């Protein structure tokens, strides 16, 4: 079954994801080419297709124009700029640009460049710490939903069952 193979590959990929830790982000200002290269290299495993672009200069400029990303200092992007771009990258698969802006603007106001207290790096690290336990839960949930969907449509014609079971699996994944 194609879906079962896909699910196994997805589980393998989820286990192998190596999220960017803040220590991997350079502590020096990067120019735009360095930022796009860094993001492409670090997030290569997240590409769906080999020729997909993780981040382009146009995207960075649009994020800055739409106040998602603070302007660079003397054309250099700081570690906090890169962290902001990471949040945008992860969120854009789930949220609209306006929703991302609503979420990130208060974060930027309170924590971008904050030298006296918590900063964006602290926020990123706190969120990243949640990842390992949540990934395990996600894998278990995927398996449970797949097993549940495999039990559906038993009374339907046999040649339709696999398609309908796959359909029910996708439906289970889309419930809020």
PLM feature spans:
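Intrinsically disordered, low-complexity, charge-dense segments enriched in Lys/Arg
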Residues: 103-176
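Basic helix-turn-helix/winged-helix DNA-binding cores
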Residues: 1-110
